[in-house]
């Protein structure tokens, strides 16, 4: 092959390779694009009910499940969780972001899971671009939203009597001014009604201001993720609550 032809062939191969890399890079970016954050809090008593595991004496207040970018996860697998970076936050983390379903000593595994799956994607935002910022901002939002106090002030507290799903929806919308998303555990064969399990409040990407979780025409995700580890088996998954009665279970064990 003549030198000119060889150079042309090499240039063509190089251009093709660059096009392929560019396409792959765009697909990667598209896979990790997200538009809003979701502050997810769960009711520990229900979490323990849906997971067949060694859940013991769960907290009797709503705790953090996570701060999730929508439609994006696992954005940077080369950015490992480092407990040292959040050591100043540990007292609050243990109280308000506990791993309620496992009794193993290394409870930081739950935080590791949340960072690697969700935090590495949230880091696209300057206010969340480190582990300390991500977990610290999550704790700030937990305090600011104050879901536990809001429900109590509205007269919604754990009870053996059933509520209506609309009681939760209307009360939260009235206080926060936005449409939340509420997930329930479907009834088992020996249960009459669904059980409330998780409440999502959605936030704008850049400044973390409240916004509707669903807009007209938008379909909510039917099933929510569950934190599993050490071979734990999920018995039932959370679903968006159906309109109708709902059980808000009181803690089974009285704490002293």
Curated annotation (Swiss-Prot):
GO molecular function, one term: RNA endonuclease activity
Residues the record marks as carrying a glycan: 76, 106, 212
GO biological process, one term: RNA catabolic process
Biological source species: Homo sapiens (Human)
Activity control, per UniProt: Inhibited by Zn(2+) and Cu(2+).
Source organism superkingdom: Eukaryota
Active site, UniProt feature: 65, 114, 118
This protein's UniProt keywords: Disease variant, Disulfide bond, Endonuclease, Endoplasmic reticulum, Glycoprotein, Hydrolase, Immunity, Innate immunity, Lyase, Lysosome, Mitochondrion, Nuclease, Secreted, Signal
Protein's cellular compartments: Secreted; Lysosome lumen; Endoplasmic reticulum lumen; Mitochondrion intermembrane space
GO cellular component: azurophil granule lumen; endoplasmic reticulum lumen; extracellular exosome; extracellular region; extracellular space; lysosomal lumen; lysosome; mitochondrial intermembrane space
Disease: Leukoencephalopathy, cystic, without megalencephaly: An infantile-onset syndrome of cerebral leukoencephalopathy. Affected newborns develop microcephaly and neurologic abnormalities including psychomotor impairment, seizures and sensorineural hearing impairment. The brain shows multifocal white matter lesions, anterior temporal lobe subcortical cysts, pericystic abnormal myelination, ventriculomegaly and intracranial calcifications.
Disulfide cysteine pairs (residue numbers): 48-55, 75-121, 184-241, 202-213
Substitution effect: residue 65 to Y: Abolishes the effect on degradation of mitochondrion-associated cytosolic rRNAs
Major localization class: secreted
Name of the protein described by the UniProt record: Ribonuclease T2
Stored SUPFAM superfamilies: Ribonuclease Rh-like
EC numbers: 4.6.1.19
InterPro entries from the UniProt entry: Ribonuclease_T2_eukaryotic (IPR033697), RNase_T2-like (IPR001568), RNase_T2-like_sf (IPR036430), RNase_T2_His_AS_1 (IPR018188), RNase_T2_His_AS_2 (IPR033130)
